């Protein structure tokens, strides 16, 4: 049986992204095959990588939390090559950059001057109550970086090309060796000439001022799944900022917030509301229409219904997120309206009823809920 990924990384299930990254760094440093030559270290390292690969991505983490390893059996591309690891590359660099001689420096050089993924973006979106219940299409407006169409993202004027930085020879890093009585120490820092890109643009593109990207505002249509709630996060792939040097774009994360409704409240996948009936309807029973998110529905009030009775309309609640065929219920709290005053005709009838029931009436003292009507 596969070990729990949280257990592998030594973290709790509610750990945040930063704590997860710190745990991964600590274990990756300890079990990396180039550092740890003990039997089983390489397998342990692969196990750690797999756990972090799943838990560091919000969508795969959510599937893992719900379905376990079977829910993420196809997630991730594995760890074939450190140079192709995207976000993992930065972590590895921070783990191993302190080793003498700059461990893995050829890979670091290729990475700094190679493709870089664009930044992820966040957008907060408000929904009406019924939009959150039933979902649907929503148009949003976003502002993000897109590759310059004139220079195709290179930042160089058309007809020219960036040149290799002469300061760092294209590595994006400069090294300084300090000799001491205890040995030589190498300090690695970002190249100040090319800012770590390994390339220098001499003739900048006029359209983007050499940045390779422009800020663009555009409209998008996104699909809101049925059953979303406050805090639900949607990922819109490749709609973040453009990548650098041919790298992929980041993602857009849309955080959903649901406006309150005057009539309905939500409790998980159930909907709550109140209905007010007269005392006679409560005593005798009745049929009446009540509002639901699906529209008016007939409700039968049984005779003798007591105040604060909760009545259930099955399958009239919120669709279950990810399985909209399954819905919660609509729970109605019955409030009974007892009038402060009654007409003379009503009073006469109620007094007759009180005599039949044997209740005392008049100023001498009243019993039962009818008493308030005779004051």
Curated annotation (Swiss-Prot):
CXXCXGXG motif repeat start-end pairs: 148-155, 165-172, 191-198, 205-212
Domain of life: Bacteria
Stored PROSITE patterns: DNAJ_2, ZF_CR
Keywords: Chaperone, Cytoplasm, DNA replication, Metal-binding, Repeat, Stress response, Zinc, Zinc-finger
SMART domains: DnaJ (SM00271)
Single GO MF descriptor: heat shock protein binding
Positions with a binding annotation for Zn(2+) 2: 165, 168, 191, 194
SUPFAM superfamilies in the record: Chaperone J-domain, DnaJ/Hsp40 cysteine-rich domain, HSP40/DnaJ peptide-binding domain
Cellular component terms (Gene Ontology): cytoplasm
Residues binding Zn(2+) 1, per UniProt: 148, 151, 205, 208
Needed cofactors: Zn(2+)
Localisation per UniProt entry: Cytoplasm
Comment field on protein domains: The J domain is necessary and sufficient to stimulate DnaK ATPase activity. Zinc center 1 plays an important role in the autonomous, DnaK-independent chaperone activity of DnaJ. Zinc center 2 is essential for interaction with DnaK and for DnaJ activity.
Classification via NCBIfam families: DnaJ_bact, PRK10767.1, PRK14293.1
Record function comment: Participates actively in the response to hyperosmotic and heat shock by preventing the aggregation of stress-denatured proteins and by disaggregating proteins, also in an autonomous, DnaK-independent fashion. Unfolded proteins bind initially to DnaJ; upon interaction with the DnaJ-bound protein, DnaK hydrolyzes its bound ATP, resulting in the formation of a stable complex. GrpE releases ADP from DnaK; ATP binding to DnaK triggers the release of the substrate protein, thus completing the reaction cycle.
Name of the protein: Chaperone protein DnaJ
Biological source species: Nostoc punctiforme (strain ATCC 29133 / PCC 73102)
Gene that this polypeptide is encoded by: dnaJ
